[in-house]
Curated annotation (Swiss-Prot):
GO terms for cellular component: plasma membrane. It comes from Sodalis glossinidius (strain morsitans). Its EC number is 2.4.2.43. This is Undecaprenyl phosphate-alpha-4-amino-4-deoxy-L-arabinose arabinosyl transferase 2. The chain crosses the membrane at residues 4-24, 81-101, 110-132, 176-196, 204-224, 255-275, 288-308, 313-333, 348-368, 381-401, 409-429. One of its GO terms (biological process) is protein O-linked glycosylation. Keywords: Cell inner membrane, Cell membrane, Glycosyltransferase, Lipid A biosynthesis, Lipid biosynthesis, Lipid metabolism, Lipopolysaccharide biosynthesis, Membrane, Transferase, Transmembrane, Transmembrane helix. Belongs to the glycosyltransferase 83 family. Pathway: Lipopolysaccharide metabolism; 4-amino-4-deoxy-beta-L-arabinose-lipid A biosynthesis. It comes from the Bacteria. InterPro entries: ArnT_tfrase, Glyco_trans_39/83, LipidA_mod_glycosyltrf_83. It is found in: Cell inner membrane.
């Protein structure tokens, strides 16, 4: 029974962090509403080859990530749990791979479970793993690729080694079909330092074609199918989504080279105290511990690769956290009390700092000129304070006996995990989580023949909630500019200066609803035709125009 306790503890972490809260969290726009709607449309249409978003061609990503979400919605229905489940499931599988690789590297089950728990409870991993985006899926395939490569290079010559390289190729192929060519580049860059240090070039050249075969065999059927259906897909996907995003000055999400340093530091909480020592030890042992050096390359090379990219988002470095968890678990097992005590102090201070920030800055009575919470949200303030008090309390608990209790740090994010969905300020909900607003005005929306929105994310929320993909865009095209450029999408977008004339004619055919997300700080809508009904909540406004009989 004693030997089962670590495994049970890991399963409890996964359940409490990644499964229990999912049903109680609204969808964020634009990301979560986007991916929810794309998969809903795939299931509704039966077309799993060409991605469509609001009925328009959407070529920003390949299809496998959507397929995972499709299966989730098919299994769990039209629910927020289903939308989030694909990400959480991918993180859980990656945690299992972390455990497996620890067994292969060090033959230590306890160390493997510790590494999996560290991975699952890292702040960045948890934040992304409960957020409906595709990054957990690509992290899963990259972890599978790195595990397959390690299995291959450790296997004796023959069919087992070949099978390992074939599995590497399959994982890379699935990664390519999830997020593109980075799934091919990142594993190559990650293993490069180890291959050079171990002088394994000959083996890679001999067995590498098997990996290439696996990748091609996995992805080629879909590659051909979408090229036949949509000949322009590969031009857009390669040039816009790869070349421009990585290299051009007008790339999306531009950030400086050092952007990922603070992201890494914050993302490793509640294990930040272990980070410097784990990296330092792996570097010092690069000559004697080939496994540790393999993990170090897996951490550092993707970080450098994405730091060189012009476009940056915190989610991009998620693949580096699996090897980082392994290195930190190994370091913690032998580092002694000092680093473990530092880790506890950092968690205590972080929790207290966040408590002070929520209670004295963000609260209605706080120091901020425009507090995040308003007067009737004291309950939410208290929930936020309680969530971070749990973090501080667990940090303090580990300080009582650092060498014995340090693993309890995995429980630091528990309060946030269980309470954050109930502590979101209303002004944030009214701008970033449109589901509640949509449900309030649902009767007006359901009787509208035409529905417009001036935000792609809000439009996606409307489509998801109403289960209709014909939501059109008003004034701003955003990420759907490419899909709207096709002739068959000409009636799916209207500019503000044309709206009055369009409205005069189309109101003869049916009611019109326009949902506007006001710019931050703007309070009036005086430049649009007067609506028959108006409803406003925060920055979201519904303008309803009734049908006019000819």
């Amino acid at each position: 029974m004693k030997s089962l306790k670590p495994g049970i503890g890991l399963m409890c972490i996964i359940a409490l962090y990644y499964l229990l809260p999912l049903s109680f969290r609204s969808l964020w726009q634009p990301d979560e509403t986007r991916y929810a709607e794309i998969s809903r449309e795939m299931l509704a249409s039966g077309d799993w080859i060409v991605p469509h978003f609001l009925g328009l061609r959407y070529f920003e990503k390949p299809s496998v990530g959507y397929w995972i979400n499709n299966l989730s919605q098919w299994a769990f229905g039209h629910t927020n749990f289903a939308v989030h489940f694909g990400s959480a499931f991918s993180i859980a599988l990656t945690a299992l791979m972390v455990y497996w690789l620890a067994l292969r590297l060090w033959q230590d089950r306890w160390l493997g479970l510790t590494a999996a728990a560290i991975y699952s409870s890292c702040l960045l991993v948890y934040s992304i793993g409960t957020y409906a985006v595709l990054d957990p899926m690509i992290a899963l395939w990259l972890a599978a690729a790195m595990c397959a490569f390690w299995q291959a290079v450790q296997a004796p010559r023959g069919w087992r080694k070949g099978l390992g390289y074939l599995a590497l190729g399959i994982a890379c192929g699935l990664g390519f079909m999830t997020k593109g060519f980075l799934a091919l580049a990142v594993p190559v860059l990650s293993v490069l330092p180890w291959v050079i240090a171990q002088k394994r070039w000959k083996e890679v050249f001999i067995y590498g074609p098997l990996a290439l075969l696996g990748a091609v065999a996995t992805s080629l059927p879909w590659v051909i199918a979408i090229a036949r259906r949509e000949p322009d897909f590969w031009h857009y996907f390669i040039w816009v989504e790869h070349v421009q995003r990585f290299a051009e000055d007008n790339a999306q999400h531009k950030a400086p080279f050092w952007y990922y340093l603070p992201v890494l530091l914050a993302g490793t909480l509640p294990w930040l105290g272990l980070l410097p020592g784990a990296l330092r030890r792996a570097w010092r042992e690069r000559q004697t511990q080939s496994g540790a050096f393999y993990l170090l390359g897996w951490v550092v090379m993707p970080l450098l690769f994405f730091s060189l990219s012009k476009g940056k988002l915190p989610t991009y470095i998620l693949p580096s956290f699996a090897p980082l968890a392994l290195l930190m678990a190994r370091y913690a097992a032998t580092c002694g009390g000092r680093a473990l005590k530092v880790n506890g102090v950092l968690n205590l201070l972080f929790g207290l700092l966040c408590v002070i920030t929520v209670a004295s800055v963000l609260a209605p009575w706080g120091l901020a000129q425009h507090p995040l919470f308003v007067q009737n949200e004291v309950r939410k303030v208290l929930l936020g304070v309680l969530g971070f008090l749990v973090w501080a309390a667990v940090g303090g608990l580990t300080l009582r006996a650092p060498t014995v209790c340090w693993r309890w740090a995995a429980l630091c994010p528990l309060g946030i995990a269980l309470l954050v969905g109930q502590a979101i300020p209303q002004q944030v909900i009214d701008a970033k989580q449109p589901q509640s607003f949509i449900q309030t005005v649902r009767p007006q929306l359901e009787k509208s023949r035409f529905i417009f929105a001036n935000s792609v994310g809000v439009a996606a929320g409307l489509a998801w909630e109403l289960q209709r993909s014909d939501i059109s865009l008003f004034e701003l095209q955003g990420e759907l500019a490419y899909g709207l450029s096709y002739p068959d999408a000409a009636d799916r977008f209207i500019r503000e200066e044309d709206f009055s004339d369009w409205l005069r004619e189309r109101c003869k055919e049916g009611s019109v609803a326009l949902v506007v997300l006001l710019p931050d700080g703007e309070t009036q809508i005086s430049h649009l035709p007067r609506a028959d009904e108006t409803y406003r909540r925060g920055r979201l406004v519904l303008l309803a125009y009734h049908q006019r009989r000819p």
